[in-house]
Design a protein with these regions (language model features):
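Glycine/proline-rich loop-helix segments at beta-alpha junctions forming the active-site rim
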Residues: 91-173
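A short, flexible beta-alpha/helix-coil linker loop
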Residues: 47-50, 83, 125
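Short acidic (Asp/Glu) patches
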Residues: 27, 56-64, 97-106
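Residues at the starts of beta-strands that form the adenosine-phosphate
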Residues: 40, 73-74, 149
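Short connector loops at secondary-structure junctions
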Residues: 73-90
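Active-site and ligand/interface coordination hotspots across diverse enzymes
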Residues: 1-57
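A short mixed-secondary-structure module that forms the rim of ligand-binding clefts
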Residues: 49-71
Length: 173
C-alpha cells in the first residue's frame, strides 16, 4: 500500500507578518490561511472570500479574535469548499473534485503538523449546495481518525447548524 505524500505546511513572510497561505498567491480558490503556531484553532467555514495575509475580512477578524480570547497560540481558516466567492450563491453548482481532493490533502497536512482544536463554523450556508454536507463529513472523518476535539461558539441555528463567525456577537468567547 502506497502512502500519500502530503504537502508541506510552510510559513511565509507576507504583509502583517508570518502566515500560512496556500496557495501562496491570490487565486480563485484557497486552502489554508492562518497564523503560525503549534496549537491552532482551526475554523471550518463554507468557502473563502477575498481575505489574504494582512488583509483579513470581517469573518477572519472574528476568527482571530475568538482564537486569541480562548488561549490558542494561532488560528487557521479552512473551508468545506475552497472556491473563493464573496457571495455563496456564486459557488460552483457541481463541485470540482480535484479542488475537493486537494483541500483534503491540505487538511491532512495541517492535522499532521499541528495539535489543533477544530471549530465547526459553517452556519446555515451548508445548505447552499447539495454537495456541501458530504464534503463536510469527509473533513470531520479525517479529524475523527486522530481524535481531534471540536468546538462551536454561540448558539446553534434553528436547523441545528453551528454559528458562522461573522454572525457571532462581538463579546462571544
Amino acid at each position: 500500500m502506497q502512502t500519500e505524500q502530503l504537502p508541506r505546511l510552510e510559513a511565509g513572510e507576507y504583509p502583517g507578518g508570518i502566515w500560512y497561505y496556500e496557495p501562496h498567491t491570490y487565486l480563485p480558490y484557497r486552502y489554508v490561511l492562518g497564523r503560525v503556531g503549534r496549537h491552532p484553532l482551526v475554523c471550518i467555514g463554507i468557502n473563502p472570500s477575498t481575505a489574504q495575509p494582512g488583509a483579513l475580512d470581517p469573518t477572519l477578524k472574528s476568527v482571530e479574535r475568538l482564537a486569541n480570547a480562548n488561549g490558542f497560540d494561532s488560528w487557521i481558516m479552512f473551508n468545506v469548499y475552497p472556491q473563493r466567492a464573496t457571495d455563496p450563491n456564486d459557488m460552483d453548482r457541481v463541485p470540482d473534485r480535484a479542488l475537493c481532493d486537494e483541500n483534503l490533502r491540505w487538511l491532512r497536512a495541517v492535522l499532521a503538523e499541528t495539535e489543533p482544536t477544530m471549530w465547526a463554523a459553517w452556519g446555515t450556508l451548508i445548505e447552499k449546495r447539495d454537495y456541501l454536507p458530504g464534503l463536510m463529513r469527509e473533513m470531520v472523518a479525517l479529524t475523527r481518525e486522530r481524535e481531534i476535539p471540536w468546538v462551536t461558539f454561540g448558539r446553534r441555528s434553528k436547523k441545528g447548524h453551528p454559528h458562522h463567525p461573522l454572525y457571532l456577537r462581538k463579546d462571544s468567547t
